[in-house]
């Protein structure tokens, strides 16, 4: 075979839309398996082999296995999958999404409230009301389609979508609200069904008889009957649900068929009434509609239904002695009110007429019903109070937004398809098509019915919520054809089926939330029975549903129900907005007819409906969400679901960092950005209290609201898996310890070994942080002198910190520092030895802002050798300076007296010199010693520069020099000749004798200062001292520098050494 004809591969085109592989056999379609391989393929199912074809991409055996980029993608992880697998998911768009969603959306509210909404708002404003409600659900459906096609939707439906996209906190909060929405919806459906039974099917069942149903007060007999029978029906339906979900599923198609027939009967009735011009009649005095029971009372005392007597009814629409007694009985009584006179006058002066209640669809009626006529409670017509025992009056006041709140539950139910994702053959196609189609269909049905009612029923009858004028018959049922029972029975069955569905789905939703283990209090509800039924969840659902039933009225329950659904819908829209605006890499929805502005409009509409309907209830819903959010955050939501809130946080952080300029801040804006260096002994069996105490101190310094990073040094290598596992455990411990001391910040670990200490520390200081958010303050602990590793680390941390121009804070006696819960009183003493820009005072001030140190008093001891004649002037100048700094502190000037070198000092200095020589000899005798790099390359000690910036706080190094007080420059000064040798390093050209004298002088300073501090601060809670500039010569650091500091702090319990870089200038400016 020639090279030109030789083939090295075969290519198969994949139809991604149909999830089928197109073979070469004449267009034959091959079924594709779950892993993307044809189901009947019997060969090697691996894409790569250990030898040959893709050996280039085969990983070394020593390297941990990584996922191939062509491996299967699964979202979410295995632990997030449903516990039960369906044998076969074969439902399509129609049976799996479209019809169930329509069945859930269309309900009792459409039959018992839509006509009344039209009567109050008019056709035009009802169109606007429906537009707002339907548009909010349509936009939410679009957002839902985008989110649902951006991955696999598991059990939990809407809760799964929200929690996996907004995080555990928001997911739990909105999940609980969605659970409450389903539970309270069950209450509304049950109360609506009871209303249909008692008002329109069997009024004789009412306790107190049919007449008791006329008492429409909140705690009147009508609503008490609804509460009682609602509780009975709730228990019956709970028993049915406890028997299993299969029975509930059997009722769904029956309920849907009855609803469809009822809608068709309404439309048929509008047409039939227009053709025949026959229908039920009503009586009215002028335009005041009368209750039919009053009109029929003289002849049919106990009759409440008269469908077969429409012809004779108009004969009863005439004034009679009985009607006169109803309207004018109290006129002649002494207890007669002004209203009684008005009722009687209207009755006697106006004509009583018989009107056709259902003239059939016509433009005249439509025009008459076009504009709103909102009414207050007990009004018979707008602005006129009616006689409640005789006329048809309103049982509650109405406004546009109140009507919107009542009707909004009629458009909910769009998550039905999402909840059935596990039963769908192709969820990513079925959910968008089915949900949006169902939303558009139901919206069209509502518009058609609203126009039908507005054009087929007179205005006065439309306002008759309970059908009092037509023999307590449902208004929509009286319009229908061929028989009112089609609508009445259909309305009841729709409520019964919908309530069963809610009682079935709500406990399972609660179980999904509890199973995620983000709300500990819900843990018991994760358990199920042997038949996989969440019995405990059902019990809680019944209890909450009973609370909803106790509200009594459908309208009251609907107003509460809105907010649960609206919060859920708003967050689904926000998910889509969040992912789109942040351009998340994993945001690749298959649903293409989506734009984030639509989702933003949907979220805005949801919040608008909430706050327009009821500001108090909206605030309660938002507060409930916030409370659950903070509860989950407080309990520690340890789930990581790759949610969008993390993406939002990252984007916000990026934006903020870019706004912060990467340069030194103005002195007014300086605050400690703390890097806490920990060299503790990390062990699972032992807790090193030094690390916890360091974190405690770091938390107490966070009054400056700066950055905090805790870094633990570990001896090891990044190449060792054992060391990496240990580092991960240490970081976990560190995070827990930071949380326990309430230090909010970041934790990290750093490996080092004996040959990398210098580069490790230097690299850490140079690289840590990002942009303008970099640590400027290093907090480190005095090392354990018996641990050589800690000594070497400490030396490098100090030297490189100084070279990097960081503020250094060194703690001594860290285990004696107070814990978070302690409250100290006493003194915080600042021993001001060198001019440092005021960093000691700033650190002390920040510590005092914390509740641990708040009870302490600041004292400043300025050490000086000024003569007594100038001491008072210096004290006055310093007092003014402290006052202008706005720091409350007591100021003391300390004059050192005895300057003689004692024998003790000479002995200690000689000891330091002897140790120095021993270590030098040891260093020379060992090649490749750990600290070979302590010297410069030329073998000479590194020259040490003063760390205190000349521009910020300069002083003369010559003995006897004095600096002046200049308050305009916020300077304080005092004689520093005494400490020149102590607070600076020696020069490289000093001979041994000069070095010995220098050591004696430094040791003398340490001893003298220690005695003075112990004399003046014997009981201080904390002492702050200037940190002498460290030598860059490591041998000098280990041999003498640490010894001086040890002597300086001898017998002092808590000490902070603070060394400024000169940038931390505390100013008197505002």
UniProtKB/Swiss-Prot annotation:
GO terms for molecular function: potassium:chloride symporter activity. The chain crosses the membrane at residues 92-112, 114-134, 142-162, 174-194, 196-216, 228-248, 251-271, 400-420, 433-453, 473-493, 534-554, 557-577, 600-620, 791-811, 827-847. Changing residue 602 to D: In nj94; defects in thermotaxis. One of its GO terms (biological process) is potassium ion import across plasma membrane. It is found in: Cell membrane. It is a multi-pass membrane protein. Probable potassium/chloride cotransporter that functions in the amphid sheath glial cells to regulate thermotaxis behavior. By maintaining chloride homeostasis, negatively regulates guanylate cyclase gcy-8 in the thermosensory AFD neurons and thereby controls the microvilli receptive ending morphology of the AFD neurons and thermotaxis. Modulates the temperature-evoked neuronal activity of the AFD neurons such as calcium responses to temperature gradients. Might also play a role in the chemotaxis behavior mediated by the sensory neurons AWA and AWC. This is Potassium/chloride cotransporter 3. It comes from Caenorhabditis elegans. The lineage of its organism: Eukaryota, Metazoa, Ecdysozoa, Nematoda, Chromadorea.
């Amino acid at each position: 075979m020639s090279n030109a004809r030789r083939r090295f591969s075969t290519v198969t085109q994949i139809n991604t839309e149909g999830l089928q592989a197109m073979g070469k056999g004449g267009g034959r379609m091959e079924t594709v398996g779950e892993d993307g391989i044809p189901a009947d393929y019997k060969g090697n199912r691996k894409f790569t082999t250990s030898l040959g074809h893709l050996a280039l991409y085969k990983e070394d055996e020593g390297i941990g296995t990584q996922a191939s980029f062509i491996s299967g993608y699964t979202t979410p992880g295995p632990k997030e999958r449903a516990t039960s697998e369906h044998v076969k998911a074969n439902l399509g768009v129609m049976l799996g999404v479209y019809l169930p969603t329509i069945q859930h959306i269309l309900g009792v509210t459409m039959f018992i409230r839509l006509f009344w909404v039209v009567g109050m708002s008019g056709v035009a404003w009802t169109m606007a009301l429906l537009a707002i409600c339907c548009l909010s659900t349509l936009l939410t459906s679009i957002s839902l389609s985008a989110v649902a096609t951006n991955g696999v939707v598991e059990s939990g439906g809407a809760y799964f979508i929200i929690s996996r996209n907004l995080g555990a906190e928001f997911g739990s909060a909105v999940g609980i609200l969605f659970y409450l929405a389903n539970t309270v919806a069950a209450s509304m459906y049950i109360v609506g069904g009871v209303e249909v039974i008692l008002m329109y099917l069997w009024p004789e069942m009412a306790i107190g008889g049919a007449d008791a149903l006329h008492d429409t007060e909140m705690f009147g007999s009508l609503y008490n009957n609804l509460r009682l029978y609602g509780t009975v029906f709730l228990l019956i339906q709970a028993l049915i649900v406890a028997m299993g979900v299969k029975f509930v599923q059997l009722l769904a198609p029956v309920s849907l068929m009855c609803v469809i027939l009822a809608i068709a009967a309404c439309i048929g009735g509008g047409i039939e009434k227009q053709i025949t011009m026959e229908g039920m009649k009503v009586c009215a005095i002028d335009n005041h509609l009368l209750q039919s029971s009053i009109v029929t009372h003289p002849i049919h005392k106990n009759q409440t239904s008269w469908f077969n007597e429409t012809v004779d009814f108009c004969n009863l629409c005439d004034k009679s002695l009985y009607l006169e007694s109803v309207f004018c009985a109290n006129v002649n009584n002494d207890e007669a009110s002004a209203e009684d006179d008005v009722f009687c006058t209207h009755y006697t002066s106006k004509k009583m007429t018989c009107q056709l209640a259902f003239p059939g669809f016509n433009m005249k009626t439509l025009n008459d019903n076009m504009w709103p006529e909102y009414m207050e409670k007990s009004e018979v017509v707008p602005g006129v109070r009616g006689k409640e025992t005789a006329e048809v009056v309103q049982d509650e006041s109405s406004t546009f937004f109140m009507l919107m709140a009542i009707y909004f539950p009629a458009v909910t139910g769009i998550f039905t398809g999402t909840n059935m994702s596990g039963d769908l053959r192709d969820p990513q196609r079925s959910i968008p098509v089915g949900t949006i189609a169902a939303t558009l269909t139901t919206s069209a049905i509502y518009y058609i019915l609203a126009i039908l009612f507005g054009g087929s029923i007179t205005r006065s009858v439309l306002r008759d919520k309970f059908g009092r004028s037509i023999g307590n018959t449902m208004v929509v049922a009286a319009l229908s054809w061929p028989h009112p029972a089609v609508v009445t029975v259909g309305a009841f069955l729709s409520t019964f089926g919908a309530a069963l569905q809610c009682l079935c789905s709500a406990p399972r939703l609660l179980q999904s939330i509890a199973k995620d283990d983000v709300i500990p209090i819900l843990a018991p509800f994760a358990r199920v029975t042997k038949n996989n039924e969440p019995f405990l969840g059902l019990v809680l659902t019944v209890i909450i549903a009973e609370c909803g039933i106790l509200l009594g009225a459908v309208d009251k329950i609907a107003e509460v129900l809105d907010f649960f659904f609206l919060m859920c819908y708003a967050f689904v829209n926000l998910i889509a907005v969040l992912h789109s605006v942040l351009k998340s890499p994993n945001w690749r929805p298959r649903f293409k007819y989506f734009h984030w502005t639509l989702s933003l409009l949907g979220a805005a509409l949801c919040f608008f409906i909430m706050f327009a309907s009821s500001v108090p209830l909206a605030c309660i819903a938002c507060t409930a969400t916030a409370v659950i959010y903070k509860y989950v955050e407080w309990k520690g939501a340890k789930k990581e679901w790759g949610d969008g809130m993390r993406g939002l946080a990252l984007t916000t952080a990026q934006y903020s960092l870019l706004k912060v300029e990467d340069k030194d801040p103005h002195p007014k804006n300086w605050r400690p950005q703390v890097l806490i260096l920990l060299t503790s002994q990390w062990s699972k069996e032992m807790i090193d209290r030094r690390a916890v105490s360091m974190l405690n101190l770091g938390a107490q310094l966070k009054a400056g609201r700066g950055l905090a990073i805790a870094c633990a040094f570990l001896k090891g290598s990044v190449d060792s898996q054992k060391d990496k596992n240990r580092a991960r455990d240490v970081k976990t411990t560190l995070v827990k310890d930071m949380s326990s001391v309430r230090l909010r910040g970041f934790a990290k670990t750093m490996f080092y070994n004996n040959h990398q200490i210098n580069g490790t520390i230097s690299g850490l200081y140079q690289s840590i942080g990002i942009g303008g958010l970099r640590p400027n303050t290093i907090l480190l602990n005095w090392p354990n002198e018996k641990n050589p590793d800690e000594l070497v680390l400490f030396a490098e941390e100090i030297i490189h910190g100084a070279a990097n121009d960081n503020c250094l804070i060194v703690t001594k006696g860290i285990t004696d520092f107070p814990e978070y819960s302690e409250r100290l009183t006493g003194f915080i003493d600042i021993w001001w030895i060198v001019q440092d820009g005021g960093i000691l005072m700033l650190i002390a001030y920040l510590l005092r802002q914390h509740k641990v140190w708040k009870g302490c008093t600041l004292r400043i001891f300025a050490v000086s050798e000024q003569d007594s004649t100038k001491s008072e002037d210096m004290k006055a100048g310093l007092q003014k300076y402290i006052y202008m700094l706005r720091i409350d502190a007591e100021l003391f000037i300390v004059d050192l007296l005895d300057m003689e070198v004692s024998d003790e000092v000479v002995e200690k200095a000689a000891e330091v010199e002897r140790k120095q020589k021993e270590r030098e000899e040891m260093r020379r005798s060992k090649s490749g010693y750990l600290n070979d790099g302590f010297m410069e390359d030329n073998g000479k000690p590194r020259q040490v520069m003063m760390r205190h910036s000349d521009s910020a706080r300069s002083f003369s190094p010559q003995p006897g020099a004095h600096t002046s007080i200049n308050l305009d420059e916020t300077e304080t000064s005092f004689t520093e000749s005494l400490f020149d040798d102590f607070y600076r390093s020696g020069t490289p050209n000093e001979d041994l004798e000069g070095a010995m004298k220098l050591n004696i002088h430094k040791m003398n300073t340490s001893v003298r200062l220690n005695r003075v501090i112990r004399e003046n601060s014997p009981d201080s809670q904390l002492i702050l001292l200037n940190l002498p500039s460290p030598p860059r010569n490591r041998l000098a650091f280990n041999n003498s520098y640490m010894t001086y500091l040890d002597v300086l702090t001898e017998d002092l319990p808590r000490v902070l050494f603070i060394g400024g870089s000169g940038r931390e200038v505390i100013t008197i400016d505002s």
